[in-house]
Amino acid sequence: MTILKQFAILSILATTVSAAKAQNPIINHQFSADPTARVFNGRIYLFPSHDIISPVEPEKKWFSMADYHVFSSDNLTDWTDHGVILSQEQVPWGNPKAYSMWAPDCVEKDGKYYFFFPDAPKPLAT
């Protein structure tokens, strides 16, 4: 097979792959990133970041995260959005205007669930 023919075949394959769409996106109504998946009591839970258009800098269309949602499923096809479980205004030590809540996680220990996450702290008083 000639190099030109190989290149043509690879080009067609690359075009086909790039045009493929997800057939069952888990989250299709909001921008999300950095998910953690955990199984609790036979049900899978997703804890993603929730990316919004910044109310402070609207031209910045990424990395503006003010809250967390949690999603769950028992069959990996049908997902429930349990809504906002925590917002930056509820974090006493967090900067309510930082929009930097990302990469959360949740664990269970002795029947209690612990949700943890990074957030920008309030500015120190000088």
Enumerate the predicted regions with their spans:
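Bacterial Sec-dependent N-terminal signal peptides
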Residues: 1-23
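Carbohydrate-active catalytic/glycan-binding domains of CAZyme proteins
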Residues: 20-126
